Amino acid sequence: MNSTQATTGMTTGSATSADGTTIGYLQVGTGPAVVLLHGGNESARSHAQLALALADAFTVYLPDRRGRGRSGPHQADHGLRTEVEDLTAVTAAAEAELVFGVSTGALIALCAARAGSGIRRVAAYEPALLMDAGRYTGWLGRFDQELAAGKTAAALITSLHGLDLAPPAFKLMPRPLAEALTNAAMKSEDRKAGPEDVTMRRLAPTVRYDGLLLAETAGTIARFADVTADVLLLGGDMQRPGFIRPAFDALSQTLPRSRRAEFAGLDHGGSSDPGPTNRSGQPAVVAPAIRSFFAQQ
């Protein structure tokens, strides 16, 4: 089952963020409300299979972060505050106290819980938090230039290398070849895409905002000592971006009400639907831990 098939039969809705921007979402299931917040280079559809795995026990909401699907565009002043306001708008509309987030989505969920948004439990899959700015934000200038020049494949390769997310084969091959392969993959995806499919090409402009979010929150680990929500830190034991493990370990010691669970054989995309750009996704493996955590009173 692919993400498009998994979303068949889901209903749609929307919430209005503090600045008036529409935040669209998919909805499925019956029971207490749970919001699943996707990470960078993803959309609401990226966790459709995880939503279905939880839908017999929860009403699951899958919001599109800005610039994707049914949600409105980024504004000039977009930043962490905006992301928290967008998530808060959805949790308020859904009357949700339970949030799962992955990567930057996990970071946003933790920040929203810290801001007093009424979130009671957060399941955070490999939160994308930098212990310091370091080398993981230096790619943004080149990325913006390449995207502005219409070199989408080049921009995506720049972000993959800058965030230590490039597949091993891409790290070894000449950059022009990696760009050519990425461009061919995008063209193939474009030909097959339906009107609601969120393709790599459509997602590319959103990547910069995740990079800016990383830069804005770099070095803020101490702030998370203020989070009063119960937190389940989730992750895989495979190769991750280099900054994930230090943050994962630091958060487990900083968050006052946290526990951790790690999954053998999973990587940074472990909770997301499997597909051409995420061949290692195994949401069915992650779902039981989330279900158990959210079922606790």
Description of each model-found segment:
Residues 257-297:
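Catalytic active-site module of serine/aspartate enzymes centered on a nucleophile-bearing elbow/loop
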Residues 227, 233-235:
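Short beta-strand/loop motif that positions the catalytic acidic residue
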Residues 96-135:
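Conserved hydrolase catalytic core segment
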Residues 182-219:
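Hydrophobic, aromatic-rich cap/lid helix
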Residues 41, 65-69, 129, 265-270:
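Alpha/beta-hydrolase active-site loop signature
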Residues 240-247:
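Conserved alpha/beta-hydrolase "acid-adjacent" motif
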Residues 61-100, 104, 276-285:
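Active-site loop/oxyanion-hole signature of alpha/beta-hydrolase fold enzymes
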Residues 14-72, 76:
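Conserved HGGG/HGGXW glycine-rich cap/lid loop of the alpha/beta-hydrolase fold
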